[in-house]
């Protein structure tokens, strides 16, 4: 959540590459730790007889997200930058070059990514709320989510 908000607000305001590098490293470590914490909890919550179905459902939801979230972000990026003069000018330059029969060079389109990054932060908030719910459920039903899998 914090990383996406830093990318949305702090990095554009400061222009600091150091902050951007540190933020992307923290985000990468976070992405690596989530599966390490998530996958071992599944067999503690789900009955063994339906464990395979549970894993397939998890993969299905992840793949739907991988399919639909880029479409959502692309649509939001286009609509939130429709009135951005720099984006409009860059797109007009590309269209003008195409109309002249010239292959458009790699023209930098200066999109404002604030809204998509806030959406990612909202996904993070939703995940945090689900994690807190799971922790409360663990406390109530004693799944042992924070206990080691290997017992001595």
Segments predicted by a language model, with ranges:
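Hydrophobic core of transmembrane alpha-helices in multi-pass small-molecule transporters
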Residues: 17-33
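A membrane-interface helix-boundary motif in multi-pass transporters
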Residues: 75-124
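Intracellular juxtamembrane helix-capping segments at the cytosolic ends
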Residues: 33-47
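A late C-terminal transmembrane helix in Major Facilitator Superfamily
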Residues: 49-82
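C-terminal ends and interior cores of transmembrane alpha-helices
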Residues: 1-14
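Multi-pass alpha-helical transporter architecture, strongest
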Residues: 104-105, 109-152
């Amino acid at each position: 959540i914090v990383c996406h908000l830093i990318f949305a607000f702090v990095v554009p305001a400061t222009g600091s590459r150091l902050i951007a590098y540190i933020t992307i490293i923290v985000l990468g470590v976070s992405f690596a730790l989530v599966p390490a914490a998530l996958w071992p909890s599944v067999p503690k919550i789900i009955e063994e007889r339906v464990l395979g179905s549970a894993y397939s459902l998890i993969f299905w939801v992840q793949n739907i997200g991988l399919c639909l979230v880029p479409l959502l972000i692309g649509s939001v990026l286009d609509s939130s930058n429709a009135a951005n003069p720099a984006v409009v000018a860059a797109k007009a330059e590309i269209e003008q070059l195409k109309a002249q029969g010239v292959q458009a060079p790699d023209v930098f389109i200066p999109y404002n990514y604030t809204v998509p990054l806030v959406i990612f932060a909202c996904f993070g908030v939703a995940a945090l709320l689900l994690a807190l719910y799971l922790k409360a459920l663990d406390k109530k039903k004693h799944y042992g989510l924070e206990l080691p899998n290997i017992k001595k």
